[in-house]
Structure formats: structure tokens, C-alpha cells
Amino acid sequence: SISAMQFIQR
């Protein structure tokens, strides 16, 4: 699964 930071930095 992905982290919140990974999702927003995308």
C-alpha cells in the first residue's frame, strides 16, 4: 500500500 506522503508527492 502507499503512504499519504507518497500519494501527495505524486
From Swiss-Prot:
Keyword match Cytoplasm: no
GO molecular function annotations of the record: metal ion binding
Cysteine disulfide links: none
Keyword Nuclease: no
Required cofactor names: heme b
GO BP field: photosynthesis
TM segment ranges: 1
Membrane topology: Single-pass membrane protein
Free-text remark on how the cofactor is bound: With its partner (PsbE) binds heme. PSII binds additional chlorophylls, carotenoids and specific lipids.
Similarity section: Belongs to the PsbE/PsbF family.
Subunit note: Heterodimer of an alpha subunit and a beta subunit. PSII is composed of 1 copy each of membrane proteins PsbA, PsbB, PsbC, PsbD, PsbE, PsbF, PsbH, PsbI, PsbJ, PsbK, PsbL, PsbM, PsbT, PsbX, PsbY, PsbZ, Ycf12, at least 3 peripheral proteins of the oxygen-evolving complex and a large number of cofactors. It forms dimeric complexes.
Function: This b-type cytochrome is tightly associated with the reaction center of photosystem II (PSII). PSII is a light-driven water:plastoquinone oxidoreductase that uses light energy to abstract electrons from H(2)O, generating O(2) and a proton gradient subsequently used for ATP formation. It consists of a core antenna complex that captures photons, and an electron transfer chain that converts photonic excitation into a charge separation.
Listed name of the protein: Cytochrome b559 subunit beta
Originating organism: Capsicum annuum
